């Protein structure tokens, strides 16, 4: 695989996921506070969180999983091709047929999820996301799953966790945050997210020393 393709795919999907996560957290400040409280308890205020902390930040991981459920970075994954003729759920699939997986629909299917349109990170509490048996598939599954999935989760976890740990976030103005999506292979926000952030008083010295 071309290194340039891997880098572009990794940066675009990760940055899009972080923008959606911040949008959801600004829309649900109580969730933002809960994520910050978890970081404060497990990491403290004397240092920045690092990769080794991520395994202790279960609620932060739940926030990421719920963001990926509602706004999968690649809602149709990548095209696959059937290697042989087959029948799936009564549908004939010829050999060589291009196949797409509609993650957006699967992730919002009321047969699979309680209140599928609601942002509820708690739904993943106490359960590994992979344990949702083909319900949560932001990176595909099996041999052809995204090879950068684990790295992407670490990047998003570290970046999002640092933004929550170090800064207080507020939406700008009284109007609701626009959650409309733009069409594309990756689904970005229709409007770039604008928000107000200021350093947390407890983190100013650490930030100053960077």
Range-by-range predicted roles:
Residues 4, 36, 40, 64-72:
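Amphipathic, well-packed alpha-helical segments that form the structural scaffold of globular domains
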Residues 1-18, 50-53, 57, 86, ...:
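Conserved cytochrome P450 catalytic core segment spanning the I/J/K helices
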Residues 35, 67, 93-96, 119, ...:
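Hydrophobic, well-ordered secondary-structure elements that form the walls
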Residues 40-42, 134-135, 139-210:
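Cytochrome P450 proximal C-terminal region
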Residues 29, 48-90, 110, 117:
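Conserved cytochrome P450 K-helix E-x-x-R motif and the immediately C-terminal K′/meander segment
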Residues 83-85, 101-128:
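Conserved cytochrome P450 K-helix/beta-meander segment immediately N-terminal to the heme-binding cysteine loop
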Residues 13-31, 36-38, 150-166:
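Cytochrome P450 catalytic-core helices
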Residues 89, 96, 101-102, 198:
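Generic beta-strand/beta-sheet core signal
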């Amino acid at each position: 695989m071309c290194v340039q393709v891997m880098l572009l795919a990794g940066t675009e999907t990760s940055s899009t996921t972080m923008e959606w996560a911040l949008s959801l957290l600004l829309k649900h400040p109580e969730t933002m506070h809960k994520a910050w409280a978890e970081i404060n308890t497990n990491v403290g205020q004397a240092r920045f969180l690092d990769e080794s902390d991520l395994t202790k930040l279960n609620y932060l991981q739940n926030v990421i999983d719920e963001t990926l459920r509602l706004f999968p970075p690649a809602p149709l994954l990548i095209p696959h091709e059937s290697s042989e003729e087959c029948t799936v759920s009564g549908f004939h699939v010829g050999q060589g047929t291009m196949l797409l997986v509609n993650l957006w629909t699967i992730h919002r299917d009321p047969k699979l999820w309680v209140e599928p349109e609601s942002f509820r990170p708690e739904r993943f509490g106490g359960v590994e996301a992979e344990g949702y048996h083909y319900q949560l598939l932001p990176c595909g599954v099996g041999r052809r799953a995204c090879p950068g999935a684990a790295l992407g989760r670490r990047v998003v976890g570290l970046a999002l966790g640092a933004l929550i740990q170090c800064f207080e976030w507020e939406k700008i103005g009284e109007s609701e945050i626009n959650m409309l999506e733009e069409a594309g292979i990756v689904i970005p926000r229709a409007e770039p997210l604008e928000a107000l952030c200021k350093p947390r008083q407890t983190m100013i010295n650490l930030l100053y020393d960077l």
